[in-house]
Amino acid sequence: MKNFSIAKSRRLRSTPYTSRIEKQGVTAYTIYNHMLLPAAFGSIEDSYKHLKEHVQIWDVAAERQVEISGKDSAELVQLMTCRDLSKSKIGRCYYCPIIDENGNLVNDPVVLKLDENKWWISIADSDVIFFAKGLASGHKFDVKIVEPVVDIMAIQGPKSFALMEKVFGKKITELKFFGFDYFDFEGTKHLIARSGWSKQGGYEVYVENTQSGQKLYDHLFEVGKEFNVGPGCPNLIERIESALLSYGNDFDNNDNPFECGFDQYVSLDSDINFLGKEKLKEIKLKGPQKKLRGVKIDIKEISLTGSKNIYDENNNVIGELRSACYSPHFQKVIGIAMIKKSHWEASQGFKIQINDNTINGNVCDLPFI
């Protein structure tokens, strides 16, 4: 499938930064939570190298928030996730797989505890707000559920710390990973978390004041010149090498947390109540029959739309390739695949059909780097 233009419509939301990134040379978008998400600024490989050496500003406003508040908000948030939040603290972020009644994944958001009775669920690409509203209605919870006007910009890369210190002062460098606090920019307070969808380090600014956020975006580029700041976006190569999983690509509502390696976030032994708990107990007892694994494929390029079956030497399907890219580090194609138990051990060989050619590959551990 070739890249193609996206038709404008009321259903397709732009972001407060769209006009800026278009001037900065965005070359591709994807759709994420019904909103434009930049997918490329020229060469993905060049952007990958820049991200790992310098600092980038990302328009990730498509990472929408589901705000849940009210006296039953903590009970509802806990019902949605298999992770025990009973000891969660204000000012912290928590990676929280959201589970349905069958024990399958609905989303894998980061949950921010703003107050004892106020939470933001920073979602991946699915309509979590309707899931939350359905549970709230069915359980008659006293909560308010809205999508607030919050447009995240991310500052990512090894030089992000120096850039953010220059703008916000020494205090911001003291934020611990997955911690957040409020920082002033020209008289406006912004919630800033030490987080982001890369493993190169950085921050995410949860912009509630659009005008101030746009000024901050421009200011970061102005004062970031000495750090070789550039525009960017979540990078396919970096995320696959780092095994940063993508809902809708690497896993979806047909998969459960044990198949995706989320065991540490599944609290089956605590007395908390969450949807699908008994189903997950059954799944754990039986053991998963497939798992997400890394793969290395002996080719130099790949264009993946959807998924591709993986075969053993007897042409039996043993899994499917779900994400893939050429890795400059390994000088071959690497990917994330769902592999059957019989073939998920590292170094297990397989075959895959690409452009009418049979290519050999091997299973490996995640992350790659």
Swiss-Prot record:
Catalytic reaction annotation: S,S-dimethyl-beta-propiothetin + (6S)-5,6,7,8-tetrahydrofolate = 3-(methylsulfanyl)propanoate + (6S)-5-methyl-5,6,7,8-tetrahydrofolate + H(+)
Binding residues for (6S)-5,6,7,8-tetrahydrofolate: S122, E204, Y206
One Pfam family linked to the record: GCV_T
Means of activity regulation: Non-competitively inhibited by MMPA, weakly inhibited by substrate analogs dimethylsulfoniobutanoate and dimethylsulfoniopentanoate. It is used as an intracellular osmolyte.
Classification via SUPFAM superfamilies: Aminomethyltransferase beta-barrel domain, Folate-binding domain
Gene Ontology annotations of biological process type: methylation
Coiled-coil ranges per UniProt: none
Record note on quaternary structure: Homodimer.
Protein name: Dimethylsulfoniopropionate demethylase DmdA
Species of provenance: Pelagibacter ubique (strain HTCC1062)
